[in-house]
Design a protein with these regions (language model features):
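Basic, amphipathic N-terminal segments
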Residues: 1-428
Length: 428
């Protein structure tokens, strides 16, 4: 009987798991059907046709590549999506990584072309998809929304199980330094909508990395970079952690990030002084100038990844600084205005702190994600089924033990009544 009960429990668990898988598959198909319905209404749109052809060409290139030696070419490497408004410097940052790509010209002197819809970057350890800034712009129109949804449909078709391994959210330092709360929150809200779409589409909360571009506009950044070696300039500059969930979690994460970053900058500054490196006034003030970005970044993060009872809370993983092109000027701060500026050594189109971010940080984080938190109907049903099953099993086991005890006691009583002489003989 015990074996039978165990078999029933195992069978029930397998049925629940199978039912959940069927439900997930049907829901994914339903989402695809919705996207396809929208696409059919715009099937004659040449922009969408170009988008589909471009995607298929890149996927075919992947399928025919040597990655098939290691398994499904679409699943061998992690995939990352890069989003940010037009002019934020995301395409420049990817171009200046100094990483090899099989289909893109990534020379340091290569001209930066605006992203039409999306561009693929096939790096050796990761696949990066750079998306058009208009997809996440507060001024986006209906056609931009249709293109974005088509892109999600294609992404779902290509990687139905794996989805995205991470999302890089790009915002430039100039916007953060200006600290226009209304604009930053508006930008963050639009990005939050796109992030929530992706989370619901793939049923997981993937890591999100905030990349602050155009960091050369921070007073002292370029002068400080000029004191570092080539190897140091390839390293990532930022903070990696896991934000807690709940109200104010993004603020706590931001506080830890800026404390960690500025402390390391101060230690490096001290180390430079000990080694006899000439420290200009901008280099001395650089850690303090970095702190000027914090208020604006707080406004942006609260709208982009802050807790919201109606939305899934994104998994904030890291904050990083980078520069793909040094303009030779910076946004003056309060402290820098009282000092005489030092001449800037021009470093034309040099990628700073980008190589390891795209080449090591992102690929190393593959497989890091959290399940969604909002309870949907299926989770409620499966949880209730689990409780009912657990109670049923406990009732069955208890009933079995009670019945066994009663049957054994009855049998012993019958034996004692049938052979009373044996008991008497034993006593003599």
């Amino acid at each position: 009987v015990t074996f039978a009960l165990t078999a029933i429990v195992v069978a029930l668990a397998l049925l629940i798991r199978l039912a959940r898988r069927i439900w997930i598959t049907r829901r994914s198909r339903f989402k695809l059907a919705q996207s396809e319905a929208v696409a059919r209404r715009h099937s004659g749109n040449p922009i969408l046709l170009d988008l589909v052809d471009k995607w298929k060409a890149s996927v075919d290139l992947l399928r025919k590549s040597s990655l098939k030696r290691f398994g499904n070419p679409l699943r061998v490497l992690p995939w990352y999506l890069v989003v940010g408004e037009s002019g934020s410097g995301k395409t420049t940052a990817i171009t200046r990584t100094r990483l090899t790509s099989v289909v893109k010209n990534i020379a340091q002197s290569a001209p930066i072309l605006q992203t039409g819809n999306f561009d693929w970057w096939f790096f050796s350890k990761a696949i990066v998809i750079d998306t058009a800034g208009r997809y996440v712009s507060p001024q986006s129109v209906e056609s931009d929304q249709i293109e974005w949804e088509k892109l999600l449909e294609l992404l779902t078709r290509s990687r139905p199980k794996d989805g995205l391994d991470g999302l890089v959210v790009v915002i430039d330092a100039e916007r953060l330094l200006q600290n226009n709360a209304e604009q930053l929150q508006q930008c963050g809200r639009v990005l939050r909508e796109r992030i929530d779409q992706l989370i619901r589409l793939f049923d997981r909360r993937f890591p999100i990395y905030v990349l602050i571009t155009k960091s050369d506009l921070i007073t002292g950044f370029t002068q400080w970079a000029n004191t570092l070696s080539e190897d140091q300039l390839e390293q990532a500059m930022g903070y990696l952690g896991v934000a807690k969930q709940g109200d104010g979690s993004e603020g706590d994460f931001l506080a830890k990030a800026f404390t960690s970053i500025t402390d390391r900058l101060k230690h490096l500054r001290l180390d430079m002084g000990v080694k006899g490196v000439v420290l200009t006034s901008e280099v001395l003030l650089f850690p303090s100038e970095v702190q000027r970005l914090r208020p604006g970044l707080q406004q942006f993060l609260s709208a982009c990844v802050g807790n919201n009872p109606y939305l899934e809370q994104p998994l904030l993983r890291g904050i990083f600084f980078a520069s793909g092109r040094q303009a030779g000027t910076s946004v003056a701060g309060i402290l820098s205005e009282v000092l005489r500026p030092s001449p800037i050594k021009q470093t034309a189109d040099h990628g700073l702190f980008l190589h390891d971010f795209f080449g090591s940080i992102l690929p190393r984080d593959r497989g890091i994600f959290l399940p969604t938190q909002i309870v949907n109907r299926w989770n409620q049903v499966t949880r209730n089924l689990a409780w009912v099953s657990w109670l049923a099993v406990n009732v069955a086991i208890t009933s079995f033990l009670l019945l066994s005890y009663a049957a054994t006691k009855s049998t012993l009583s019958q034996i004692e009544a049938a052979f009373p002489a044996i008991d008497a003989h034993t006593q003599v």
